Amino acid sequence: MYFTEEHEVFRESFKDFLQKEVVPHIDKWEKTGNIDRFIWRKFGDMGYFGLSYPEEYGGLNLDIFYMVIFLEELQKINSGGFAAAIWAHVYLAMTHVNVEGDVRIKNKYLGASISGEKIGCLCITEPFGGSDVAGMRTTAIRKENSYVIN
């Protein structure tokens, strides 16, 4: 089995957190289409947004199995909207900042995203590609002090 005793302790702790802090609000959030701001900070305070991110930005730099547990338990609360919002923040937005951002960008946004102070998203669309990031056809070519977008 891939999961250690530490992983299972994390699983139980995260399940308890979700039941106490998230589940009581799900119906309201689903009905209004808005997730209260306080929960983002609570996720950050508990370290959940930083599981796999570098320690120098406030992350915990843990192995991938913590992320697997995080996603498994998040899905079990039966709120696709909430799970998608958290997933988009942690994986779509923050991953790009972590992988592609220079130190200045990481200092400004990655730590604030890990703490829950800022909420990330990834907004991309093309006429024929929709939101399929891998299928993007637009290019940006640097020409002197600007870019040519095609």
Predicted segment positions?
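Glycine-rich flavin
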Residues: 23-150
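Residue-level signal for inorganic ion chemistry
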Residues: 7, 18, 102
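Intrinsic disorder at enzyme termini
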Residues: 1-6
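A ubiquitous short alpha-helical element
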Residues: 8-12, 77-80
